[in-house]
Amino acid sequence: MRCNIKRLFTLAIGVFAATLVIISFSKDNYEREWKQGPQSNEARAVGHQSPDLFPVGQNSLPHQPIPPSLGEKDLSDPFNFLFSSNKITLRKLYDLTKNVDFDQLRQNECKKNITLSKFWEKSEQRNVPEDDNWERFYSNIGSCSVYSDDQMIDNLLHDLNTSPIKHVHIMDGGTQVKFVFTFKNDKQAVFKPMRFGRDYESDPNHFYFSDFERHHAEIATFHLDRVLGFRRAIPTVGRVLNMTTELFEKAEKKLKKTFFFSPAKNFCFVSRCDYYCDTTHAICGLPDMKEGSVQVFLPDESAVPRKHNRSPYRRTYSKKNQVAEWQSSMNYCTDKVKTKRQYAHGRRLLDLVDIHILDYLIGNQDRHHFESFNVFNDLPSYAIHLDHGRAFGRSDFDDDDIILPLRQCCILRPSTFQTLMNFYSTPKSLTKALHESLSKDPAHPILAYKHYPAMERRLAKIMSHILECFESRGVAEVLVAEYNNPDVSDAEQNDEEQSEEHQDKKDDKKTV
């Protein structure tokens, strides 16, 4: 009996020891896997990702820094990177386009350019007030671009940055934190607060539709749109606010209730929205200073109506079905876009390519709709460049799907080609011109310098794709002032546009 007990005791000790060894071995393997972290397909595809960017599978939220304009100035060289244009690509582009009459083509891109005030004065004998910079901006909205007078825009940006705030309320309909500022002159603007510093990169495990919005992306995109000569983005400027006197004391009641002091004694708010409006994602000052972007309101739609149209290159906005038809078929533009009446004639398809060139340069995957002014009667409307808060999220990854409209449709506005070619071929690069423009913003520096080589890299890819189109389709077919598909009648174009807009109002963006 005593012998059996001793044997059982020895056996139990052995089993216990073996169990400890197994547990220790598993834990060691688990920790090793956790430290390594999963690598995304996107990161692997680039091949030059810095090992410090994503050391684990999921990023932790960084501390909220002070506004860069209030901190120490970054004296490093923003252009301390190697980049040169592909000489073979440049030579081929020059040779293929040397006989193109760009002056004539550019004249036909927008045949009648008239401002809103001139149009109403002529068509309705109606005078448009110009008592402040908001009204001057509205009255000078044109039939070819949102603005054309740079000095007028600079004056408006100054007012957006300095005008006393009268009232602050939560902007309805936004997925993330946005406020509406009403200034002393009763004019309004949209405010997006700074959540992260300039260096923060999007988590590769986040979908484009759940990524955090970045206020500085709105500022930088406005300047890039201006540098590229589009002038179809909405004027946006950086502004540093005192959260106590300029936000809390001016806030509506339901917003004011969401303010609190953090354990670090910083003043914070949560606000109300669909995503990230909770204490975990609170936005805090240091201790109560906060930077954000201020974007002028477009004129009220009751006075200046706009069309709201779904992009044919809209992503799925689904976790389950992540690949849209246009992402899997290179014939998509020919079969499904050029055959639609609203894209088969006029400037609309060229606008679509322009906006995707802009999106590709800034890394914006979140382009689901676009708007256009519906006020100039028979004059063709253009796509307004709106909603760039999720741009500039990744400097290490180029989403080449964004540029598929150019590659599939193979058409391009002559002025766009000339602008891109100029930046690609001359010493004053695209990012140098952008940096010069951004340095005028009161909240500069606006972008982390690591985005500059990313933009130059993407520009080089765009030029390569343009060359491919020239060689496969011919320059005359690619560079066009207007697109016209002879196989599609334009008789019912307006009816189809109205039908599309009506459907879009019923079918808002969803994530599944």
Swiss-Prot record:
Lineage: Eukaryota, Metazoa, Ecdysozoa, Nematoda, Chromadorea
Intervals, Cytoplasmic compartment: 1-6
GO cellular component, one term: Golgi membrane
PANTHER family: DENTIN MATRIX PROTEIN 4 PROTEIN FAM20, EXTRACELLULAR SERINE_THREONINE PROTEIN CG31145
Biased composition (Acidic residues): 489-499
Lumenal side: 27-512
Residues of this chain annotated as glycosylated in UniProt: N113, N242
Catalysed transformations (reactions): L-seryl-[protein] + ATP = O-phospho-L-seryl-[protein] + ADP + H(+); L-threonyl-[protein] + ATP = O-phospho-L-threonyl-[protein] + ADP + H(+)
Transmembrane region(s): 7-26
Cysteines joined through disulfide linkages: C110-C144, C268-C284, C273-C277, C333-C409, C410-C469
Localization per record: Golgi apparatus membrane; Secreted
Keywords: ATP-binding, Disulfide bond, Glycoprotein, Golgi apparatus, Kinase, Manganese, Membrane, Metal-binding, Nucleotide-binding, Secreted, Serine/threonine-protein kinase, Signal-anchor, Transferase, Transmembrane, Transmembrane helix
Membrane-related topology note: Single-pass type II membrane protein
Family under the similarity heading: Belongs to the FAM20 family.
The species this protein was found in: Caenorhabditis elegans
Reported function: Golgi serine/threonine protein kinase that phosphorylates secretory pathway proteins within Ser-x-Glu/pSer motifs.
Gene Ontology terms: biological process: protein phosphorylation
Protein name: Extracellular serine/threonine protein kinase CeFam20
Highest taxon listed in the record's lineage: Eukaryota
Main location: Golgi
Cofactor(s) required, per the database record: Mn(2+)
GO function terms (MF aspect): ATP binding; manganese ion binding; protein serine kinase activity; protein serine/threonine kinase activity
Keyword Nucleotidyltransferase: no
EC number: 2.7.11.1
Binding site for ATP: Q176, K192, E213, Q295, V296, F297, L298, E371, D387
Active site residues according to the UniProt entry: D366
